[in-house]
Amino acid sequence: MIIKTILRIFTFAKPYRVSLTISVIALFMVIGINLFAPMLARDLIDNTDGWTNQATIIAVTLVLAYLLRGIMQMVSNTLSHWASLYTCAQIQKKVYAHMQKLPRSFYADRQTGELMTRVTNDVDQVEELVSHALPDTVSNIILAVGVTVAMFIINVPLATITLLTILPVLTVGLFQKKVNKAFSKMFKDTATQNTMLNENLQGIREIQLFNKQGHENERVGNTFFAVAKSAFHAIRWYSFLSPGIGFFTSLGQVVVIAAGGYMIATGSLTSGDVVAFLLYIGLFYGPISALSNTLETIQKSVAGASRAFEVLDQPITIEDGAVVANAISGNIEFEKVSFSYEDSDVILDHISLSIPAGQTVALIGATGAGKTTLLNLIIRLFDPQQGKVSIDGTDIKDYTLESLRNNVSIVSQDVFLFSGSIRDNIMYSKQDSTIEEVYAASKNAAIHDFIMSLKDGYDTIIGEKGVKLSGGQRQRLAIARAFLRNSPILLLDEATSAVDEETEMEIRRAVIDISKGRTVLIVTHRLSSISDADRIVVIKNGRVISDK
């Protein structure tokens, strides 16, 4: 799983392969200098002829080698960080783009905070993997092998003693599965924490109104401690290992120094050999000691990337069609349509309904009868399990999603507004609109006068989800947004439920005016709105029981 996930990560790094290649080359140069420098030091110390030109050349070469090593380290680190950061951005962009194509049922089963964590925190772990963990692991392995060879070249018995003292450190690999599982648990707990925080911050008004501050403090506070507990569980194996690694590292150095001193006394080693050997020991234990940290980072990064890839692997059930819906007239046909949400009763039961272009139809019925579901099927937020929905005689599954939705405007009871300006929110449905068109749509939605009364007019910032506006104002803004789009099909789902009677009358007159030549479906409980319709369709238990 680890190798498969790492290989998948690097498919996103392809645009930056040149930078990564240069970074790897620079890293290999650093390794080469690290392996070469102790030999130069040995030659310098073993020079018995005094300070000669050869000694000067060796000393200058050693200084230049260390200078070059510093430059190559800077090049390697800079390029690897640049490539890893942009690789993370590529993954995040891909995951987010995929999330936009997923059906509503996917979001119904998941919480916003969890999904945000997968796109942000989990993917961010990849940066450490690409920039540090993998390069460090590769360089440490190569360095350890190179140092081992060099030590055996210098003195076989001393090299053998060194390897024997380091064997216990290699047991770190036995803990990989436990660590990976622990870090996955930590990321899951972090997602739960973010979800609760997001939900609480959005519902702060209700928390205060119902005096639930203490309850929520306790509930959310528990998630902080849950994350701390799982994080501690993930790192405690390394807390056990670190003292052991340190002990065996020190033990090896003591043994080597003692054995080396004995060999110098017997004449089997020169002073230069011992100095070179001690330098190699530092290089040898360094990579081995760092192995635990790099493995920890790899485990964290792979666990985080796997959670992000789980989203990317979710199937897209709403497939795009190939037919571009140009200049449709608005004939809508439901043919024996059946639909149910996951793990729920049947919402629509073999409904057949024909709506000619230009007709205004009111859909009425009890809550849960299936009225809103009919509208959602038209814009393909869901697809029916049975039957077919057609527009102008063409199955809407054959249309491209973009062209289909460009021909439909919808105003829902649950209005969503972005945190920008009023102008930005209205123009969200049609970015190339003129200001005159924006004014006209706002007037039809009976909100233009209110907007002009504000200090900044259409440039007024409305806050997150339009928090600075009342419910009725938010609804009228959404109506203006739908009117501006000027689509041949208009869907109104309890669009005036939050406005007063006078404002509703103004909006009704506007709907009557703009509905000429358009197909309009109105979901409503208000008799005043029903009276404006050409037809009234009554739905009960997912079936049409009256059509007049």
Model segments located where?
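A short amphipathic helical element positioned immediately N-terminal to and/or at the very start
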Residues: 2-15, 115
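An intracellular "coupling" helix at the cytosolic face of ABC transporter transmembrane type-1 domains
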Residues: 15, 104-105, 121-130, 134, ...
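Conserved catalytic Walker-motif region of ABC-type ATPase nucleotide-binding domains
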Residues: 99, 220, 334-336
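Transmembrane helix-loop-helix hairpins at lipid-water interfaces of multipass membrane proteins
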Residues: 2, 20-72, 152-157, 267-271
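ABC-type nucleotide-binding domain
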Residues: 327-548
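A hydrophobic transmembrane-helix motif
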Residues: 38, 134-176, 228-275
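Cytosolic ends of transmembrane helices, especially the final helix of ABC transmembrane type-1 domains
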Residues: 189, 212, 236, 283-311
